[in-house]
């Protein structure tokens, strides 16, 4: 911005800085089966000129790519979809200074069947983070084996895993020096968050039965723009979301406002599916643990950090999940072991026999919680089978 002001000042031109990405993006089905996209502009407290004047909406139909976008002046857009077709949407803010970064991609699909039930997919995976920080009295550095972090898209930022963490060896060089690593990762690419992780949830739910499926950002639910009570089933996907303690932003799975919304929802006989690598381990306070036990009937049984344990069995299906960092899809290096609390029961197990998923079939509400990200199921067919089985359980 300093360079912008300097150059424009030399030409006596006013400065306009591109806007921040929009917030509270959500898709809702209207009474006549149209899709209403809504969002809010993001205020830039550090730049008065970064105010959007228009918005670009990009749409992808089915397996096709995104179009060139269409411009609107308001903060909503109504779209008429074809039945049984999955549409993907993303929105950017625009002014004379340029175009903002896009929102996470959200998807929707309207069923051709009359009486189809409404399902909401909540995209709760917003985390961007560096690798796990090691910083105590004697050790310092980054532990890539514990958590490689979450990059935005593809990343080739690693030479090798840090081997030496001894703080007393700061300033030394070579093996044994603080920060020393080898080069086993040099030239390798690793995939991070692609901002479209919820799309497969929408597609798989739509393919599993007569459902009208729409998606929303988690902040739109937290801020009350989306009412969970409008939906027969709610699917919360968290990916690698967690409050890691060292990032500049808190990436909490179940925030206080989200917990309150879910507690209200299940009191009305709601049905909830939750998946993510840290859905239980991210809940450390007594109130947070109480929420897990009351809503999902689970307790934390520990964390499985052995990336060679990638096989899962349950619902009559054997499948594997992505545990090793790779260039195709983000990996769940650590997954949660979640133990059922009566009358809930274990629905899936990891290869070592620990509990991977828990189901609760109550008269008051139903819940299905998975200690790994649904989208990390490695085989598409297996993932679709799992989703269909879970939806059948929740919808009955």
Annotate the PLM regions.
Residues 2-50, 83, 97-117:
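Pro/Thr/Ser/Gly-rich low-complexity, intrinsically disordered linker/stalk tracts
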Residues 49-85, 96-97, 102:
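Recognizes extended acidic, P/S/T-rich segments that occur
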Residues 107, 334-336, 345-366:
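Short, surface-exposed beta-strand/loop micro-motifs that present aromatic residues
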Residues 104-232, 237-240, 376, 388-396:
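Aromatic-Pro/Gly-enriched surface loop or interdomain linker
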Residues 240-349, 386:
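A glycine-rich, often tryptophan-bearing local segment used as a flexible ligand/cofactor-contacting loop or short
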Residues 115-125, 132-147, 225-285, 361, ...:
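Short alpha-beta junction capping motif
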Residues 1-19, 372-396:
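A recurrent domain-boundary module in secreted/ectodomain proteins
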Residues 87-91:
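Hydrophobic/tyrosine-rich beta-strand signature of extracellular beta-sandwich/beta-rich modules
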């Amino acid at each position: 911005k300093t360079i912008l002001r300097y150059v424009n000042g030399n030409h006596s031109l006013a400065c306009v800085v591109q806007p921040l990405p929009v917030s509270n993006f959500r898709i809702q089905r209207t009474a006549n089966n149209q899709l209403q996209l809504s969002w809010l502009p993001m205020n830039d407290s550090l730049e008065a000129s970064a105010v959007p004047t228009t918005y670009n909406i990009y749409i992808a139909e089915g397996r096709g790519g995104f179009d060139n976008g269409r411009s609107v002046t308001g903060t909503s857009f109504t779209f008429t979809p074809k039945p049984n077709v999955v549409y993907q949407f993303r929105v950017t803010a625009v002014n004379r200074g340029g175009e903002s970064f896009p929102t996470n991609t959200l998807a929707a699909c309207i069923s051709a069947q009359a009486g189809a039930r409404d399902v909401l997919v909540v995209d709760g995976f917003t985390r961007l983070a560096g690798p796990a920080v090691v910083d105590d009295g004697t050790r310092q550095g980054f532990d890539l084996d514990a958590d490689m972090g979450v990059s935005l898209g593809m990343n080739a930022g690693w030479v090798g895993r840090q081997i030496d963490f001894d703080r007393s060896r700061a300033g030394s060089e070579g093996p044994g020096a603080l920060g020393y690593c080898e080069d086993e990762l040099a030239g390798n690419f690793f995939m991070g968050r692609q901002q479209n992780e919820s799309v497969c949830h929408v597609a798989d739910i739509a393919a599993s039965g007569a459902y009208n499926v729409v998606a929303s950002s988690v902040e739109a639910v937290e801020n009350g723009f989306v009412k969970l009570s409008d939906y027969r089933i709610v699917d919360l996907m968290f990916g690698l979301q967690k409050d890691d303690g060292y990032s500049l932003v808190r990436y909490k799975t179940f925030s206080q406002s989200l917990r309150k919304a879910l507690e209200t929802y299940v009191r009305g006989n709601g049905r909830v599916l939750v998946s993510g690598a840290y859905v239980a381990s991210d809940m450390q306070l007594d109130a947070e643990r109480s929420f897990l036990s009351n809503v999902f009937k689970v307790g934390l049984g520990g964390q499985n950090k052995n990336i060679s344990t990638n096989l899962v069995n349950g619902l009559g299906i054997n499948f594997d999940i992505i545990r090793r960092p790779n260039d195709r899809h983000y990996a769940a290096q650590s997954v949660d072991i979640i133990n059922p609390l009566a009358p809930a029961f274990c629905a899936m197990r990891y290869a070592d026999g620990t509990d991977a998923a828990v189901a609760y079939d109550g008269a008051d509400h139903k819940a299905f919680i998975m200690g790994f990200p649904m989208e990390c199921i490695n085989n598409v067919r297996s993932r679709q089978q799992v989703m269909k089985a879970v939806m059948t359980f929740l919808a009955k």
